[in-house]
Regions:
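Flexible, solvent-exposed loop/hinge segments and secondary-structure transition points
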Residues: 2-153
Length: 153
C-alpha cells in the first residue's frame, strides 16, 4: 500500500490553520462594525472544518453561516463563482433559482467567499448575522484578505 505524500499532508494542515484564522478574523471584522455574527469554514466538499460564534450572535447564525459556506464550496466550482453574492445576482430572475434553493444546505443569500489556493477552490468561509448578506460577505472577505498572501497561488 503506497504511503500518502507527506509534503501534501503538511501543506494541507498549514492551509487548515490559515483558513481557520481567516474564519476568526471574519467574526472580528463584523464585531468591529457592531455586528454579532458566526462564521463557518468548510472544505471543498462542504464538510465543516471549523466554526466561530461571536459572543452575542444568535443561534440561527450557526446554520446560515454553514449553509452560505456550503453553497460556495459545492456550487462555486461548477458555476464559476467565488462569492455567494455573485451567484445570487446570477440567479436573480432565473427560473431555476427555486430548484437550487430547495436543495439541502443551499442558501441563496450573500455572505460567503471561496478560499482559493493554486487556482482552485479549497474551502469557503460563510458568515451569518449582520443586517444583510452583503455585510456578512464583506466580513468573510475581510477575514480572507488577512491570510490570502500566505496561501499557495
Amino acid at each position: 500500500m503506497p504511503c500518502a505524500d507527506p509534503v501534501a499532508g503538511i501543506l494541507a494542515e498549514i492551509l487548515k490553520l490559515y483558513t481557520r484564522r481567516a474564519r476568526r478574523l471574519a467574526v472580528r471584522a463584523c464585531e468591529a462594525s457592531g455586528y454579532d455574527v458566526s462564521a463557518a469554514l468548510v472544505d471543498a466538499s462542504g464538510e465543516t472544518l471549523a466554526f466561530a460564534k461571536g459572543d452575542h450572535s444568535t443561534v440561527h447564525t450557526k446554520d446560515t453561516s454553514f449553509r452560505k459556506a456550503y453553497t460556495v464550496a459545492t456550487l462555486g466550482p461548477i458555476f464559476k463563482f467565488e462569492t455567494l453574492g455573485a451567484f445570487v445576482e446570477k440567479m436573480r430572475g432565473n427560473p431555476n433559482a427555486n430548484a437550487f434553493a430547495s436543495l439541502p444546505n443551499i442558501l441563496l443569500l450573500a455572505g460567503s467567499v471561496s478560499v482559493m489556493a493554486n487556482g482552485e477552490s479549497v474551502a469557503a468561509i460563510g458568515v451569518g448575522g449582520a443586517p444583510g448578506g452583503e455585510k456578512d460577505e464583506a466580513c468573510a472577505a475581510a477575514g480572507l484578505a488577512k491570510i490570502k498572501d500566505r496561501l499557495p497561488h
